[in-house]
Amino acid sequence: MPAPILPLIEAAAQWPPTGALIGLDLGTKTIGVAVSDPARRLATGVETILRKTFTTDAARLLALATERKAVGLVLGLPINMDASEGPRAQSTRAFARNLARLTELPIGLWDERLSTAAVERELIANDVSRAKRAKVIDEHAAIFILQGALDRLAVLNRSTGAA
């Protein structure tokens, strides 16, 4: 049975209360990957996958999820500034549907609006060269996406009195 693909808050209800989450920033040429600690407080970068074929990319992502004992996936959804979904969001949803057929890990979709721009500004502010930025931006965007999702879940947990 395919994994559920849900908005972040609904996906969180499917995940156990603790356990690592894998965060993904899906690009046309690369996939940035981040992982949380089991308590879901901190996101750290794992790697940038150079995209080849869906089968190859999915195999690497699921191997990372297994290695990190992940209990769920957070996929950045590139929503337009007017809250509509364009071709990139549709492509991300298609990737999620295909990935869901290969795993039982619930997939949470998280609004990634401006994540790459925010990361690029931060890297520029830290005087990271253009060449180095190109190599690390997708992994850092995955960190940004996953940390945003973790922070949102932490706020919700505090407001509901959960862990």
From Swiss-Prot:
Which BP terms in the Gene Ontology apply to this protein?
rRNA 5'-end processing
What InterPro entries does its record include? RNaseH-like_sf (IPR012337), YqgF (IPR005227), YqgF/RNaseH-like_dom (IPR006641), YqgF/RNaseH-like_dom_sf (IPR037027)
Give the main localization category: cytoplasm
Note whether Cytoplasm occurs among the keywords.
yes
Reported EC number(s) for this entry are: 3.1.-.-
- Molecular function terms from GO: nuclease activity
**Which domain of life does the protein's organism represent?**
Bacteria
Task: Supply the CDD domains for this chain.
Answer: YqgF
Identify one Gene Ontology CC term for this UniProt entry: cytosol
Recorded hits in NCBIfam families, A to Z, give: RNAse_H_YqgF
Task: List, alphabetically, the PANTHER family matched.
Answer: POLYNUCLEOTIDYL TRANSFERASE, RIBONUCLEASE H-LIKE SUPERFAMILY PROTEIN
Identify this protein by name. Putative pre-16S rRNA nuclease
The lineage is: Bacteria, Pseudomonadati, Pseudomonadota, Alphaproteobacteria, Hyphomicrobiales
